[in-house]
Amino acid sequence: MQAMLPVILILLLPCIPLASTATRATPEQLRKCKFQQPWSFLDCYHEKSDFPTYWIVIVGIINILSCTFFSITIYPTFNFGWNSPNALGYPQEPDEHIPLQHIQQPLALVQYENEPQPSLPPAISYFNLTGGDD
């Protein structure tokens, strides 16, 4: 992992001259497209960019390669999936390791047997409400 830092710095060295030339331009030259003016976006969309297109491709390729290298580097540290098929298979502990005198019965929070049971509400027939065999 410590060897990755010099590699990344070496890969970023070609971007330094491009960044220094971009800072020499005035801000008006740098912003052709103003995002706070969305009505002029279509006019700006067709203008040629000051940033060379091959740099975008180079940065994209470097991004893909560095992410791939980083993921391949850290992948073996994860202990799941097919790297470690027994990662979730916890060993079964024997039940004899707890002495029987130390096992406490759970306290009953509510003792239902001692509580008086509420009486059921009286049943009212449908026929009594309507007045007969309607």
Swiss-Prot record:
Chief localization class? host cell
User: What PTMs does it carry?
Assistant: Phosphorylated on serine; O-glycosylated, but not N-glycosylated.
InterPro entries, A to Z:
Adeno_E3_14_5
The way it spans or sits in the membrane comes to: Single-pass membrane protein
Q: Which UniProt keywords apply?
A: Early protein, Glycoprotein, Host membrane, Membrane, Phosphoprotein, Signal, Transmembrane, Transmembrane helix
Spans traversing the lipid bilayer: 54-78
Q: Where in the cell is it found?
A: Host membrane
A Pfam family of the record is Adeno_E3_14_5
The region annotated as signal peptide is 1-21
Q: Which cysteines are joined by disulfide bonds?
A: none
Is the Transmembrane keyword given for this protein?
Answer: yes
Q: Name one GO biological process term.
A: regulation of signal transduction
> Record keywords: Cytoplasm included?
no
GO terms for cellular component: host cell membrane; membrane
Q: What does this gene product do?
A: Down-regulates the EGF receptor and prevents cytolysis by TNF.
**Family assignment from sequence similarity:** Belongs to the adenoviridae E3_14 family.
Q: What is this protein called?
A: Early E3B 14.5 kDa protein
Q: Which organism is it from?
A: Human adenovirus B serotype 3 (HAdV-3)
